[in-house]
Amino acid sequence: VLFGHKSMQIVIDKIKEFRELVGVEDWIVEKDEETPRYFAELESDFSSKIEEAFTIAKKSDRSEAINSVRLEILEKYEDLDELATGKVMSAFKKLESQIVRKNILSGKPRIDGRDLNTVRQLSVETDVLNRAHGSALFTRGETQALVAATLASPRDAQRLESLDGEEYDHFMLHYNFPAYCVGEIGMPMGPKRREIGHGNLAKRAIKGVLPDFDDFGYTVRIVSEITESNGSSSMATVCGRSLSLMDAGVPLTAPVAGIAMGLIKDGDEFAVLTDILGDEDHLGDMDFKVAGSEKGITALQMDIKIDGINEKIMDEALTSAKDARMHILEKMNEVLSKPKELASDAPSMQKFMVNKDKIKEIIGKGGAVIKSIQEESGAVVDINDTGEISVFGDNQAKMQAALDIICLLYTSDAADEHRRGD
């Protein structure tokens, strides 16, 4: 990370030179005289109530208490116009942030009573959806992800058209964040910015431990449904996805877990928070997501609200993230530490080679032979120019039926019947 940061300075210096060359002037923002006055009034009248609300550990109860204070403030300033009311609410948000940040920097317990380094209570379950090929329910505090894994044939890969041409994605991850998971209502629609971004992060975190497609030729789809969210649902998805893949029998090289780190900084004073809540993300300075295995990091993403952090903060954040990741992996390994065998109802696949001069015979005139094999067995049979045959069935029985027919074709007189497509 520090090496990359050092290398970036060359580009940053060039950008600064370009800015000076162009002569872009900074925007001048008029000083707001009213918001500081409202802040002083709210601090005097409502600080104790806000501070008390932020000692409530349960998110729903805490939100209700804070909303009660908000309504009381709006009632007090009900005679103000819309612009002034907005400034009052801005002062209220600033006061919320000041109270939470001051408490943490002074060494007081965090909102839910934890110290800086404690991970919330964990619950790990696998095989929770009987008809799914693999599934897991991962819960960390008030954040929960229900993750399902589905295995399919190579033909089911997602076809993508990019500037580089056509390509196929054999590993898909869909992250769903319904409104109800944060106690809201909303119209179910297509994926939004959050779902696309969090899904991509979770996908990057696992790609490094997936088997090569040549060794495990399945198309894999992961769906993560966030059923409850209070901080870092994307990292819950990382943990649940790793578990569901191993539950499905996907031979990962190592389990992967993720954690979100936060930061409260005031001048030279700072505190790094492990496993942040939603409020700590909202009121703090950083949301630093770190995912990886026992051996190292597989994905990083940092959202930051201040100008930057120094090496000391980065070092402490990564060190604390590693400790938390090891703790989570230990809990995950207690439930499932290595991939299971493929379930009996999981798709079955086998690859083998034949002589190239046999390819035409296996396909048959107009594809008659290979179509006949697929119709009789219910399996999918693919053959490429190198002579590699892939047989894929919804279950072991269908795959074996196709294999038996292929073997029979070239060891008995039944071959003529199949070649004619009868």
Protein language model annotation of sequence segments:
Residues 385-395:
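Short glycine/threonine-rich beta-strand-turn micro-motifs
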Residues 40-44, 174-181, 213-217, 291-296, ...:
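Flexible hinge/switch segments at interdomain interfaces of large molecular machines
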Residues 11-29, 60-61, 80-88, 105-116, ...:
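Flexible, glycine/charged-enriched surface loops at secondary-structure junctions
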Residues 410-418:
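Conserved small/polar residues in nucleotide/adenosyl-binding loops
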Residues 1-45, 248-338:
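Mobile "lid/hinge" segments at catalytic clefts and subdomain interfaces of large enzymes
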Residues 128, 133-218, 296-306, 314-315:
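Glycine-rich, flexible beta-strand/loop modules in the N-terminal catalytic cores of phosphate-handling
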Residues 375-385, 408-409:
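Polar interaction faces of repeat-based domains
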Residues 27-167, 347-361, 369, 376-377:
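Extended amphipathic alpha-helical scaffolds
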